[in-house]
Amino acid sequence: MPEINTSHLDEKQVQLLAEMCILIDENDNKIGADTKKNCHLNENIDKGLLHRAFSVFLFNTENKLLLQQRSDAKITFPGCFTNSCCSHPLSNPGELEENNAIGVKRAAKRRLKAELGIPLEEVDLNEMDYLTRIYYKAQSDGIWGEHEVDYILFLRKNVTLNPDPNEIKSYCYVSKEEVREILKKAASGEIKLTPWFKIIADTFLFKWWDNLNHLSPFVDHEKIHRL
């Protein structure tokens, strides 16, 4: 694996690079494990290294979506606006369990606490809706990137927020119209979006959002959308 100098990067974020992500093939079958660092190096991504990930879309009871701006300390896509929480299940027994994506949901609960400070007792795994999976690949810069099969999780609940500033620069609940304005600002270069959020916003998000009370027709655990 390539040697990359990380001495100029945020110390806490560098420590997280040692976490073990779940390596998969393009059909989301587990084939091994590797560090978060190796999974996010473009040099390895170009050779086909692919890992499992998730994106949480958290709505309050007014049906507003929680958006976050990633902190400037983040190694991939710093300062970009994105959905409520995005991360990876780890290669451990609890987060590898695949039945009804329970392992991914456990990872999401862990990261909702780590990033947004949401108390563990406020997140019930049974309240998370696993909708579908999305495959994508994107470069953050010349060194780092993403290559993931992304599990889409919806959660509608009022929660307590206490974000970690090392993870999150800013956050807000937004309406559909406000998201459309954010997409326009991103298109004009005023702000930056993560590539996965832009892909989802351009394709499925508003259709799903219109049907928060009846998501079952949109559940598809067989197909991986390759966007």
Curated annotation (Swiss-Prot):
An annotated GO BP: dimethylallyl diphosphate biosynthetic process
Biological role stated in the UniProt entry: Catalyzes the 1,3-allylic rearrangement of the homoallylic substrate isopentenyl (IPP) to its highly electrophilic allylic isomer, dimethylallyl diphosphate (DMAPP).
Domain Nudix hydrolase: 49-199
Subcellular location(s) of the protein: Peroxisome
EC number: 5.3.3.2
Family note: Belongs to the IPP isomerase type 1 family.
Record-given protein name: Isopentenyl-diphosphate Delta-isomerase 1
Record's catalysed reaction(s): isopentenyl diphosphate = dimethylallyl diphosphate
Top EC class of this enzyme: isomerase
Source species taxonomy: Eukaryota, Metazoa, Chordata, Craniata, Vertebrata
Cofactor list: Mg(2+)
PROSITE patterns assigned to the protein according to its UniProt record, in alphabetical order: NUDIX
One GO MF term attached to the UniProt entry: metal ion binding
Keyword Isomerase: yes
Pathway named in the protein's UniProt entry: Isoprenoid biosynthesis; dimethylallyl diphosphate biosynthesis; dimethylallyl diphosphate from isopentenyl diphosphate: step 1/1
N6-acetyllysine: residues bearing it: 176
Cofactor, how bound (note): Binds 1 Mg(2+) ion per subunit.
InterPro entries: IsopentenylPP_isomerase_typ1, NUDIX_hydrolase-like_dom_sf, NUDIX_hydrolase_dom
Gene giving rise to this polypeptide: Idi1
